[in-house]
Structures are given as structure tokens and as C-alpha cells.
């Protein structure tokens, strides 16, 4: 007894229990925040609405790529491989009946670029391009006269040499590979950088549908593909997709600036197999 008051004995286990409860409560709140952020992101990038928006926005790209394919591989009976099943596959099927797709498991793939058309009869090779560095597990299949590799490369977090080497292994002799990808040196990105804004996409929360991990310049594409036995026979630029809405004056100015091809938003490279 000190001054007629007894000393309280604090139980350290009780204090620890309270701290653990507070910590768990904080973690639960943060988990809820992250889940909500992911939900919003998935609605924007991976929902049925976002899929249809993507299809509508990229119709011109699909048509242009089909024309480019027809120019380099005119034979409609050619064996064609489309990397990453999407609505582009449906466009290719309009001319080439023998189209196969390659990519993630169709039942597990929740990406926002998936097809809107029915394609149950189209053959599919299940292979994750992130495993391209594993030469021992490359799928064994027939060769293809034409491979379409459109708007996929920028989503991959693996050295592109592995991917291009894998695709080279699937090409028939003198086969054609058409690659399209965002132009890392697009004038819009240059302007954003000049204003102190990061021109490239942030890493996404929903890893099943990654955004753009790495974009490439025209010269990079050529150097990478040529290093693994492909010959670049043509490079060109397109302005895909055409922006919607916004100021007419701004749109007119951007159209004028992008009359200079290297300032356009999309880079296209056509490769031929020269090394078995």
C-alpha cells in the first residue's frame, strides 16, 4: 500500500492481445481498401463492358492488320497462328480458315482484350509466354506460314529475346511474323514527359490482366528480333487507336503532328524467318 492506494499489476499478455487485435483490425481495413481498388480497376480493364469498348476502339487496327497479313501471305490456305486470342482472331478468320491461337488457358484468362465473337472451333495452344525462357517446355506443334503478334509484347515481364526466339521456332521456312506494339517514342508520351508527367502506365493491382510492363522503340524491336534469327523486312507506324472525344482543336493539332510517322502511337514490324 502506498498512500492507501494499491499498485495495479499490468498483464503483458493482455497488452499484447490488444495490440494484436488493433494490428489485425488495421490489416483488415487496408485489405478492404486494396480489394476495393482492385474491384474498380477490374471494372475498368477486365469487365464485359471494357471488353466491348476495346473491340469497338480497335476495329481499324484489326482491319489494317488483316490487310497487312494478306499483302505478305496472300494464300488463304496458309497456317496462321494468332498470339493471344482476341477479336483480331475473328478478323483473321474472315480470310484464313486455318487459324490457331496461342496463349493462356482460355478458362483462366480474364484479360480485357479477349474476343467478343464465338470461337469454340478455333484450335488453341495453351502456353504462357512468361515461360518462354524455358526452352525445354516450348510446345511441340506444327509450323506456321504466318504468326500475328499484336499488342502482346508490351504486357510481358520477360526478356523479349526469349519470346521472339520461341515464335521463330514456330515459323515455317520463310514464314512471316507481324508484330504490332505501342510506340515508346509516341509524341504524346514525349509531351507528357516534357511536362513532368510519367508517360507510361503504372503496374496494375490485378496481375491476371497486366497493363503495359515495357514498351519498345522501332529500333529496339528490330535489334531484338534480329538477334534471334529473324530478318526485319519492313517497319511502319500507325495511329491506333483514334482518340475519341476531347477538343477538336487538340485532335486536329495531334493529327497534324502525327503526320510525321515516328510520332504515331503504334509501331509495326514485319519479320521473316532466316535462321532455323
Model regions: which residues?
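S-adenosyl-L-methionine-dependent methyltransferase catalytic module, highlighting the catalytic core
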Residues: 3-4, 9-68, 87, 106, ...
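Glycine-rich phosphate-binding loop signature in dinucleotide/nucleotide-binding domains
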Residues: 72-76, 138-142
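Conserved class I S-adenosyl-L-methionine
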Residues: 76-86
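Structural signature of beta-strand start/N-cap positions in the alpha/beta core
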Residues: 79, 100, 143-145, 176
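Active-site flanking residues adjacent to catalytic metal/cofactor-binding acidic residues
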Residues: 81, 104, 150, 182
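Conserved SAM-binding loop of SAM-dependent methyltransferases across substrates and taxa
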Residues: 86-98
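Conserved SAM-binding motif I beta-strand of class I
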Residues: 99-105
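A short beta-strand submotif of the Rossmann-like class I SAM-dependent methyltransferase core
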Residues: 146-152
Amino acid at each position: 500500500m502506498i498512500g492507501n492506494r494499491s499498485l495495479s499489476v499490468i498483464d503483458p499478455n493482455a497488452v499484447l492481445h490488444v495490440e494484436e487485435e488493433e494490428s489485425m483490425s488495421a490489416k483488415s481495413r487496408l485489405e478492404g481498401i486494396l480489394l476495393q481498388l482492385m474491384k474498380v480497376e477490374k471494372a475498368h480493364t477486365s469487365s464485359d463492358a471494357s471488353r466491348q469498348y476495346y473491340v469497338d476502339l480497335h476495329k481499324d487496327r484489326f482491319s489494317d492488320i488483316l490487310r497487312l497479313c494478306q499483302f505478305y501471305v496472300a494464300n488463304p490456305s496458309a497456317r496462321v497462328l494468332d498470339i493471344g486470342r482476341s477479336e483480331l482472331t475473328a478478323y483473321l478468320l474472315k480470310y484464313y480458315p486455318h487459324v490457331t491461337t496461342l496463349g493462356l488457358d482460355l478458362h483462366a484468362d480474364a484479360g480485357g482484350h479477349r474476343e467478343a465473337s464465338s470461337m469454340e472451333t478455333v484450335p488453341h495452344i495453351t502456353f504462357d509466354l512468361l515461360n518462354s525462357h524455358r526452352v525445354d517446355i516450348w510446345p511441340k506443334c506444327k509450323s506456321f506460314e504466318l504468326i500475328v503478334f499484336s499488342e502482346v509484347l508490351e504486357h510481358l515481364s520477360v526478356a523479349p529475346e526469349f519470346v521472339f526466339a520461341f515464335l521463330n521456332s514456330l515459323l515455317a521456312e520463310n514464314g512471316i511474323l507481324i508484330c504490332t506494339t505501342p510506340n515508346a517514342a509516341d509524341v504524346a508520351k514525349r509531351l507528357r514527359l516534357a511536362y513532368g508527367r510519367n508517360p507510361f502506365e503504372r503496374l496494375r493491382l490485378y496481375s491476371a490482366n497486366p497493363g503495359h510492363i515495357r514498351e519498345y522503340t522501332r529500333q529496339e524491336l528490330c535489334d531484338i528480333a534480329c538477334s534471334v534469327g529473324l530478318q526485319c523486312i519492313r517497319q511502319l507506324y500507325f495511329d491506333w487507336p483514334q482518340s475519341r472525344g476531347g477538343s477538336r482543336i487538340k485532335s486536329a493539332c495531334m493529327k497534324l503532328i502525327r503526320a510525321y510517322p515516328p510520332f504515331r502511337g503504334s509501331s509495326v514490324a514485319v519479320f521473316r524467318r532466316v535462321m532455323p
